């Protein structure tokens, strides 16, 4: 029997027996494929011993599926992403479908009714919204369910883009009150910008569009929907961008090639993901290159950034803290 799992993570594929030993779940039988939207979760399944094939893609794999099992709920993913994936499952026409819903029965029934009430309707869940920095052109950006801040501009990302665009455009030296060395932008032809955790490309595209000099833009995200959106936006905007799907930063051959790093790292997991961001920034930047990150409160991120860059300047914007460091 061919089974497709949707919304499952590696921990869902194991159980603990009476002796306290972890083993593959007893219900894992037959030819099973587990779909992931995020390459991190895909790699976790690949590196486990559960015997399940893993596939990572922005959309569900087509095939003659005997069974599709979908795990979702308000704490697991957004309602719009749940509905989007449920519609994709419906269009696969599996022989059998099972929903594992982590939430209230009322919410479960409401989700299913949106497909059952109009089964032939195919909805487009993408959206297009405007974004700009002061003095810059307005960009129309597309995003999909699963992208960070789908349907709206993230204020933290916008604060980061505004600070970086302003500083690069003005080619300013650092504030005289800081011990950081001046950053001579006049020598940069073109600007080499790395946008990590790019999402649909908000920060990278706004910064690139604000510059008069040519820009080499590399964008990285672990989520396939984000990569899909960033590639689409690069094509629409006519911005030459290399968009990478990765959960471990940039490849070694890119080390020491960037002038500017921008990142809006997630705050959860005790800043472990921020460690990956900043380790990548330290590797990827040229000597004299500048790292910009953003967070709501600098108290948590600043100590992490100082492990990789001894000097950190904090710039306040839109109620957020933009942390700025220079690679020695």
Regions found by a protein language model. Give the residues of each.
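Conserved proline-anchored active-site loop of SAM-dependent methyltransferases
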Residues: 67-79, 196-204, 258-270
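A short glycine-rich, Lys/Arg-flanked "PGG" loop and its adjoining helix->strand segment in the class I
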Residues: 83-94, 275-287
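A short helix->loop->beta-strand "cap" motif at the edges of active sites that frequently abuts
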Residues: 93-97, 214-215, 289
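C-terminal catalytic and target-recognition region of SAM-dependent MTase-like enzymes
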Residues: 284, 291-328
């Amino acid at each position: 029997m061919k089974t497709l799992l949707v919304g499952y993570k590696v921990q869902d594929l194991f159980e603990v027996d009476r002796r306290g030993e972890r083993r593959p779940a007893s219900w894992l039988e037959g030819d099973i494929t587990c779909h992931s939207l995020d390459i991190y979760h895909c790699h976790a399944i690949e590196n486990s011993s559960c015997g399940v094939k893993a596939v990572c893609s922005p959309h569900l794999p087509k095939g003659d599926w005997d069974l599709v099992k979908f795990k979702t709920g308000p704490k697991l993913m957004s309602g719009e992403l749940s509905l989007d994936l449920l519609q994709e499952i419906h269009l696969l026409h599996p022989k059998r479908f099972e929903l594992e819903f982590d939430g209230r029965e009322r919410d479960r029934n409401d989700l299913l009714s949106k497909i059952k009430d109009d089964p032939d309707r195919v909805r487009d869940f993408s959206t297009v919204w405007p974004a700009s920095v002061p003095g810059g052109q307005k960009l129309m950006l597309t995003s999909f369910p699963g992208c960070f801040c789908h349907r709206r501009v993230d204020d933290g990302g916008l604060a980061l883009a505004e600070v970086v665009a302003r500083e690069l455009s003005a080619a300013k030296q650092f504030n005289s009150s800081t011990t950081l060395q001046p950053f001579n932008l006049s020598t940069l032809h073109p600007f080499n910008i790395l946008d990590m955790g790019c999402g649909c490309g908000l920060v990278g595209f706004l910064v690139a569009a604000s510059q008069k000099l040519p820009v080499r833009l590399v964008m990285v995200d672990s989520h396939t929907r984000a990569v899909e959106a960033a590639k689409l936006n690069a094509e629409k905007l006519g911005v030459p961008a290399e968009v990478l799907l990765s959960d471990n930063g940039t490849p070694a051959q890119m080390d020491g090639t960037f002038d500017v790093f921008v990142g809006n790292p997630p705050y959860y997991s005790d800043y472990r993901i921020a460690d990956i961001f900043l380790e990548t920034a330290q590797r990827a930047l040229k000597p004299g290159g500048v790292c910009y990150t953003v967070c709501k409160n600098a108290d948590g991120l600043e100590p992490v950034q100082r492990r990789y860059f001894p000097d950190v300047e904090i710039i306040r914007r839109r109620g957020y803290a933009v942390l700025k460091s220079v690679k020695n």
